[in-house]
Amino acid sequence: RNNNTQGNWKSGLDSVKSLLASSALIDTSQMRIADGSGVSRYNLTSAKQLTTFLGWVYESQYKNDFISTLPGGGKRNGTLERRLKTEGNYVKAKTGGLSGVSNLSGYVFSPRYGPVAFSLLMSGYRGSSQPYRNLQDAIIKQLIYG
């Protein structure tokens, strides 16, 4: 938006939160954005906020452009390249991870249920994230096939 003020981190953050609150109807009062990349332990958002955002985008004019940026399962050069290989045509999602954190959010296009926005946020564990990625994949398969 153009409000004739010089751009800076705070005004940019305020604009993003204002857009999310007014357009996507997301309660941003408990949301914390610490950096623009999303790769910070200080970023805090909920699965509800993310799925609300995904639902809003799906109903918006940005739907096709946004979905085209998400990797599909088993697709080369994507974060799901080694995951959900046989479900590649049914899932478009983005991963996110840090030590002790494994997240997966996006859309499932189920032949049975149609499109479903989802967000699986798993954190607070020690050791390998593989069991959590396996659980996420099992949940996605259940959403696809019922």
Roles of regions detected by a PLM:
Residues A34-G36, T69-L70, T95, L120-G124:
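Active-site-proximal beta-strand/loop segments in catalytic clefts of secreted hydrolases
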